[in-house]
């Protein structure tokens, strides 16, 4: 199991109160495969740096989770198939290096 960070930009036409429940449907892929979800952080509506699909705003969400590499790929695939998801990015956070004194 590896730690991952998922950033999602959701279509701004979606109601903000329905973002977390709809995101939870996708995150079930992680829990069903034995992974864990550490934190779900909904940033809300933000201005985009450039237009995506002719939209200048999006609803940002960041999810920290632990899963197998294949599970992360499957989650990314399922998110990309959804029309309300404008962009996704899954990264592995850098490990903190301990400095010996």
Curated annotation (Swiss-Prot):
Keywords: Ribonucleoprotein, Ribosomal protein, RNA-binding, rRNA-binding. CDD domains: bS6 (cd00473). One of its GO terms (biological process) is translation. Disulfide bonds: none annotated. It comes from the Bacteria. One of its GO terms (molecular function) is small ribosomal subunit rRNA binding. GO terms for cellular component: cytoplasm; ribonucleoprotein complex; ribosome. Binds together with bS18 to 16S ribosomal RNA. Belongs to the bacterial ribosomal protein bS6 family. This is Small ribosomal subunit protein bS6. It comes from Arthrobacter sp. (strain FB24). The gene is rpsF.
